[in-house]
Design a protein with these regions (language model features):
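Bacterial N-terminal signal peptides that target proteins for export
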Residues: 18-32
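Mid-to-C-terminal functional-domain signal that highlights helix-capping/loop sites
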Residues: 47-400
């Protein structure tokens, strides 16, 4: 594209952007109205309790009662259209040109195939149903939370966007079908648990994923495929270049759609953290800013869970940090029955026991374990600090 053509295209894109922004402002007004009603439904002030530490049993009960009375249906169900079985293209395909190198993607591996789900697409759709795989890839732009779920709990049915928020977080619903005898259930994303329906209290199993910048994902997996910018829902690839929420993601911006009951001010509200919930209701958070202060790469050993907790999350873990990729990932430290200790050496993750080199994706690049992969802690995910500390109050905060 020449300079003249570029200027013309930029002017056209700017006009379209302003139109989209106006549409999105109207949309946000609906969400703000929804937030006001939802907060009123949750105004009893009872401290959240139970699994996850931030479930808010009394709050959720009140919200369910409001939903059943039809008082909070401000934003229609599926007003934000979830994607189902989108097309995927190679990184160099023209339908992938909506992505910049620094754009964030959720990467997963399925039977040796690598797939990328960009935030750019999920800003607008929030859920991507992968029906053949029985997975739902989800991202809530208001809590910055990336989570991938198995769908066995809902019989493989799809998830849709309910239009409700709980603690500013996406509330999904299961599309059980009009002829089903089963009542649909609401699923607050960061609870990963059913509410207000037949599947009340059912837990969703998470599928391991890696949130990372696009260029670094492609460098790790050049044969990856990515969600096509031509989704067939009236938005061409250029629309996916537009972040629709203005300065919402700025780290120090405390503005949220629903007012925060209280704010844990140990970190900036919109700082990204790698959070790992504890089974007993707590959690541990690794702030990206603190990780960045350690250096370009870091391998941090920790124990994710209570010492007396008989669960996978009480086992030792290691968090790999890559500043350039803006990626933090938690792994188990045992492979093939051997416990490993990691450090950064000569710009690479290395285990002391065998000298094998590992990538940020937990894959051994050289040494005795070449071709092997560490087990990701599937329950670990990236979110904004304010959100993780709302759902898991007073979490352990890792600092160097």
């Amino acid at each position: 594209m020449g300079l003249k053509e570029g200027v013309v295209w930029a002017a056209e894109w700017g006009r379209n952007m302003e139109k989209k922004r106006s549409e999105r402002v109207s949309f946000l007004c609906s969400r703000l109205a929804l937030a006001t009603v939802a907060v009123a439904a949750c105004s009893d002030g009872v401290r959240p309790s139970g699994r996850g530490g931030g479930g808010g049993e009394a709050e959720l009960t009140a919200l369910c009662e409001e939903l059943q009375m039809g008082l909070t249906s401000v934003l229609p169900k599926d007003a934000i259209p979830a994607l189902s079985n989108p097309n995927f293209v190679s990184p160099d395909h023209r339908y992938a040109d909506y992505l910049l190198p620094s754009d964030r993607v959720i990467g997963i591996e399925i039977d040796g195939e690598y797939l990328a789900f960009p935030h750019n697409v999920l800003w607008w759709h929030e859920i991507v149903n992968m029906n053949e795989l029985g997975l739902a890839v989800t991202y809530c732009p208001f809590t910055g939370s990336s989570m991938v779920f198995h769908r066995q709990n809902i019989g493989g049915d799809e998830f849709g966007v309910s239009g409700f928020l709980f603690k500013n977080n996406l509330v999904m619903y299961d599309r059980v079908g009009p002829n089903s005898d089963i009542e649909e259930t609401l699923w607050p994303q960061m609870l990963a648990e059913g509410r207000c329906g037949t599947s009340e209290r059912d837990r969703l199993k998470m599928y391991p994923a890696l949130e990372i910048e696009w260029a670094d994902w492609v460098a790790l997996h050049p044969d990856t495929r990515v969600v096509s910018g031509e989704t067939g829902l009236g938005r061409g690839g250029r629309a996916y270049t537009l972040y629709p929420y203005g300065d919402y993601e700025v780290e120090d911006n405390i503005a949220t759609l629903q007012p925060l009951e209280e704010f844990d001010d140990r970190r900036p509200p919109k700082e990204r953290v790698l959070g790992i919930p504890y089974k007993d209701g707590g959690g541990i958070a690794f702030p990206f800013g603190a990780l960045r202060s350690v250096g370009d790469l870091a391998a941090i050993h920790a124990t994710a869970g209570s010492a007396d907790e008989a669960s996978a999350l009480s086992l030792p873990i290691v968090v790999f940090w890559d500043s350039e990729a803006a990626a933090a990932v938690a792994y188990g430290t045992t492979i093939a029955g051997q416990a490993l200790t990691f450090e950064v050496r000569d710009g690479a993750f290395v285990d002391l026991e065998t000298g094998s080199q590992w990538s940020i994706a937990g894959e051994a690049l050289s040494g005795p374990f070449v071709g092997e992969s560490l087990d990701k802690i599937a329950d670990a995910y990236v979110s904004f600090w304010f959100a993780f500390s709302q759902f898991y109050p007073n979490p352990v905060l890792w600092l160097p």
